[in-house]
């Protein structure tokens, strides 16, 4: 079966091709071979065939097959990981779209203008009253918030934001009140029993009391018994000294000295400043504001002079005075104040005046009330007055002391580091409560015994027995 050609030539091939008696050679001669193909007969034949069909009106040779269509490109196979993530990505896009829609709805609710109110028939006076605060939004529990979908969570967040920015929200004033309370807080009930000064805590109070007592301020143990502050009895009977001229001399120039009931001596200076002196000397009765000045003063009653000048071998009781004296050899101390009687020089005018009164002056304004002795200074009179007081022997060491200072001296024996109380059998550096109670009972009994006979007869103890016939309690020591 022959194929159908697009040409109209249905004759045998040779006459159609123009093959006569000349044969194929004549056909080849009618079409000259192309240039460059003389060496390849197959290509020459194909070229001649294509030229022949082109001259006959055919697009291509009927012997050539139709070209195959180009291959259709195939989509690459999806990877397994992307296939698995497709549902997740789709769900995320849906949730994001839902959240955006919920936020837009909440914003529309917040920014929506209020609906026009209907005509009210209420009295206009009632409208002037302030509106009641709106009820608080319902609280959402934590489990419910966790279980809510993303869209519901966005709605809850938008509602919370609307409640926060509501115009009827109130401002808390509790922190401001607490700050004002802190600023106006009082110092507290920590008051010194000696000078009535207030402190904000117990530590500052104990540190302040150490100035009066001379003890180191330390932390009080929580289980320790707190004893009241005890004032030495000697401070209650410091003699009020005055000269014949009504308290002249030092007291008149620099102020006055007053004994107070709470214990101690209050000295008023010329500038009006009050200085409380709670530490008295056992030898002369002079009072000082702290233990340091008291101990330094006690050196004046001793004959020991441990400090010696390396230049002139002069000895001193105090190191500061020796150092001051050494400076005079080097010319470092300027002494412009000279004594007109002996030519001695002084660096301060008060030192010169004191020297003139004590050495060269014949005036003795400070006179003793119990004898005819007179003194140039108040300190000399105070040291002399102690001699007239009744001496009381110490039952521990036998030392004769004034009755006004025997209580201070007993502290050396009763509050020493090696003291053991005979009542409680404990070694302590503080006053034993049992010993203090026994001493108070003994003092009360001694006062009753020393009372007049008429008063003793009117008193009666238990069961009608006179007090004077009752046995006295034993001494605590």
From Swiss-Prot:
GO CC terms in record: cytoplasm; nucleus
Signal peptide limits: none
GO biological process, one term: negative regulation of transcription by RNA polymerase II
Keywords of this entry: Activator, DNA-binding, Metal-binding, Nucleus, Phosphoprotein, Repeat, Transcription, Transcription regulation, Zinc, Zinc-finger
Region span, Disordered: 59-78, 121-144
Zinc finger (C2H2-type): 190-212, 279-301, 307-329, 337-360, 366-388, 392-413
Superkingdom of origin organism: Eukaryota
Sites bearing Phosphoserine, chain numbering: 361
Tissue: Expressed in Purkinje cells in the brain (at protein level).
Record-level Gene Ontology MF annotations: chromatin binding; DNA-binding transcription factor activity, RNA polymerase II-specific; RNA polymerase II cis-regulatory region sequence-specific DNA binding; zinc ion binding
Listed Pro residues bias regions: 130-140
Subcellular location: Nucleus
Alphabetical list of InterPro entries matching this protein: Zinc_finger, Znf_C2H2_sf, Znf_C2H2_type
Summary of subunit composition and partner proteins: Interacts with BPTF.
Role summary: Transcriptional regulator. Acts as a transcriptional activator that binds to purine-rich GAGA sites found in the promoter of many genes including insulin I and II and islet amyloid polypeptide.
PANTHER family linked to this entry: GASTRULA ZINC FINGER PROTEIN XLCGF49.1-LIKE-RELATED, PR DOMAIN ZINC FINGER PROTEIN
Listed name of the protein: Myc-associated zinc finger protein
Originating species: Mus musculus
